[in-house]
């Protein structure tokens, strides 16, 4: 009889232990997953009943405590003023979705990072858990905000059509009749830039014989090294200075020689006139 009672008590404890383990497994399966957040009760979250991969607009203006948490900044602000009963103002960030979603004069910044990490700040409507997304089953084209640069080809002057070469004023927005001479005048600055470049040179060494001028740009790898170009520029500058000084000396010498020849052929004579000081003026 005692053995039977011990067996029944053992079975009872075994059933209780099994039920407890089963409830623990169900709880872990429902509330603890790696990919999904814990389930949310619909009564606590009137804004959205499906918090898994919902849009940011659906999360705005919700009172669900799972989406919000007590951050460090809110703890630093403290309670309301006991005299005025006005709580401290917490300035929202530029990425605060509840601010830009409800205001027609604000636009959400898609460039700035939406998840701020400063002092555990969490804007209204943001979630602490990451939202995973899967690619669509059917491929569809989309407009990307990231644009690659378009390489512009070279425009040859011969390929640019200039209607002024055949006469006539076909485009009234590009031409007008000069009231003085009565001839058509054109606004073709873009054509002039291509066919007759405004800038004749590309660098400060264009006046030198070794500098590049208009035309196709040379390969930088084929040019001589930079120190030699600098030395050529310095030598050319010194030569220009010496040439300028020599030209000044030659011009003054020629002027003095011409004046001497003039005085030799036609000397200045005063005919014995007396100067104001009483001396003779030669």
Curated annotation (Swiss-Prot):
Keyword Signal included in the entry's annotation: yes
Family: Belongs to the IIV-6 213R family.
Signal sequence residues: 1-18
The species this protein was found in: Invertebrate iridescent virus 3 (IIV-3)
Keyword Signal: yes
Protein name (database record): Uncharacterized protein 051L
UniProt KW keywords: Signal
